[in-house]
Amino acid sequence: MFKVARASQYLAITGAGIEDIKLSKKSWVFPWQSCTVFDVSPVNYTFKVQAMSAEKLPFVLPAVFTIGPRVDDDDALILYARLISPHDKDSNHVHELVEGVIEGETRVLAASMTMEEIFKGTKEFKKEVFDKVQLELNQFGLVIYNANVKQLVDVPGHEYFSYLGQKTQMEAANQARIDVSEAKMKGEIGAKERTGLTLQNAAKIDAESKIISMQRQGEGTKEEIKVRTEVKVFENQKEADVAKANAELAMKKAAWTKDAQVAEVEATKAVALREAELQTQVEKMNALTRTEKLKAEFLSKASVEYETKVQEANWELYNKQKQAEAVLYEKQKQAEAQKAQADAAFYSKQKEAEGLVALASAQGTYLRTLLDAVQNDYSCLRDFLMINNGIYQEIAKTNAMAVRDLQPKISVWNHGGEQGGGSGNAMKDIAGLYKMLPPVLDTVYEQTGMQPPAWIGTLRGAEPKQVTRS
């Protein structure tokens, strides 16, 4: 079924397919759904709230509240639809709900204030009631559109506000009498003040008139004296101007006379100067004539000699330049040769140094490799190097030469008898060699103090000697 709400109504739809409540102006309502139409137009609620002040004085607060749902807030409409819409907005349930909220907040607020505070601060009291009631109505989705709180009235049997009004009326009447008396007093005082001020102002005006008259007379006298003084000053100034003009005229006449005399002297001197200049030019022309004549006589001969000397000097200069260039070229070539030799020597030394560095690096690598091979045994490394470099052979040669020079008696060690030939003879030679080795090693140790390598064996009674290095 398709339902449409009126302008002041909403559709509250619940049921399958709707999580909570769906609000709409028009919608399809299916059989498995429920639809409630609620009106959102505001309603006037009239109350006479009975409350009690902090002094336990009762009073009645007549009020008219215009209350309705908050149509501009969907959450407030949902609250209203959930809590209020099941009841008629004009029903006793809604009326009692609103009345209970208003009475409760009004009584709580009135209990915290005295009657004097409530009566004098009626506007603030009404505002506090309005704010607190609105705060409570928010939880029902309601809003106060208008609140008209009337004048506080007494509860039957209590005449507090009547007495308070009478007190106010009496105070107003007394204040009016006081104001009238003060007005009369101010009027009489003002009249006397006006009369005194009139007399004072008249005397003041008379005195000021006399003062102004005297001032005017004095100003007239001063102006007359001032005019006379200015006339005298003007006359003196004009006389000074005439004297100054006469002096300037005399000075100009003297200057003109001086200029005329100077002009006459300058004209005379200019004539003499011009005469001297012309005489000088005549003498110069005579000298030039004689010079040209002498040039004609001697210039040709001098020119020939000059040209000859110049050519000879140029030739000598050319020869000296060429000799100097040859010497310079030879020196440059010698310097270049010396530089090339120095570069070659430097390059040779550089390469030799690089070779030594490379050899040292290779030997270092070689020694590190050997040392790692013998497990850091320096004795084995030393023996290997001596054997590899033929040190023992050199020692043997040196000892043989020394023995030969000494011509010692040679002892031959032979162990065991002779046996048959073949492989037996070869084994006999090897056995004899091994038998002769210990005496040889003993002899070497006695003469040089050097022990045989560890892989050959050790000597009995051989003690390592301490080598003292200085």
Swiss-Prot record:
One of its GO terms (biological process) is membrane invagination. The keyword Transmembrane helix does not apply. SUPFAM superfamilies: Band 7/SPFH domain. One of its GO terms (cellular component) is caveola. Pfam families: Band_7. Residues 305-354 form a coiled coil. Keywords: Cell membrane, Coiled coil, Lipoprotein, Membrane, Palmitate. Its main location: membrane. May be palmitoylated. A lipid is attached at residue 35 (S-palmitoyl cysteine). It is found in: Cell membrane; Membrane, Caveola. It is a lipid-anchor. May act as a scaffolding protein within caveolar membranes, functionally participating in formation of caveolae or caveolae-like vesicles. Belongs to the band 7/mec-2 family. Flotillin subfamily. PANTHER family: FLOTILLIN-LIKE PROTEIN 1-RELATED, FLOTILLIN-RELATED. This is Flotillin-like protein 1. The gene is FLOT1.
